[in-house]
From Swiss-Prot:
It comes from the Bacteria. The gene is rpsF. It comes from Streptococcus gordonii (strain Challis / ATCC 35105 / BCRC 15272 / CH1 / DL1 / V288). InterPro entries: Ribosomal_bS6 (IPR000529), Ribosomal_bS6_sf (IPR035980), Ribosomal_S6_plastid/chlpt (IPR020814), Transl_elong_EF1B/ribsomal_bS6 (IPR014717). PANTHER family: MITOCHONDRIAL 28S RIBOSOMAL PROTEIN S6, SMALL RIBOSOMAL SUBUNIT PROTEIN BS6M. This is Small ribosomal subunit protein bS6. The keyword Ribosomal protein applies.
Length: 96
C-alpha cells in the first residue's frame, strides 16, 4: 500500500460543527473508495502567504492515508475542488 499525506485549508469563519462535519465527510470519502485513514488531525489556524477568496487565514487539516490505488485520492481531489469550504488542498505521496 502506498502512503499519502493530504493537507487542506478550510475557510476560517466556518462554525465548529460544520468543520467537524466537513472533516468527517472527506474522511468517509477516502474510506468509502478503498483507502485507509491512518490519522486525521487539525493542525492549526495559520496566516496565509497571500489572500485566498478574501481570506488572510485558514484552518489547516492533515490526513495520512494508505491506499492501493488512486481512486479514493482522485475522488477526494474532485470533490475538494467543488467544495466552497476548502480553500486549497494538496496530496503528496510519501516515500515507502
Amino acid at each position: 500500500m502506498a502512503k499519502y499525506e493530504i493537507l487542506y485549508i478550510i475557510r476560517p469563519n466556518i462554525e465548529e460543527e460544520a468543520k467537524n462535519a466537513l472533516v468527517a465527510r472527506f474522511d468517509s470519502i477516502l474510506t468509502d473508495n478503498g483507502a485507509t485513514v491512518v490519522e486525521s488531525k487539525d493542525w492549526e489556524k495559520r496566516r496565509l502567504a497571500y489572500e485566498i477568496q478574501d481570506f488572510r487565514e485558514g484552518l489547516y487539516h492533515i490526513v495520512n492515508v494508505e491506499a492501493n490505488d488512486d481512486v479514493a485520492l482522485k475522488e477526494f481531489d474532485r470533490l475538494s475542488k467543488i467544495n466552497a469550504d476548502i480553500l486549497r488542498h494538496m496530496i503528496v505521496k510519501l516515500d515507502a
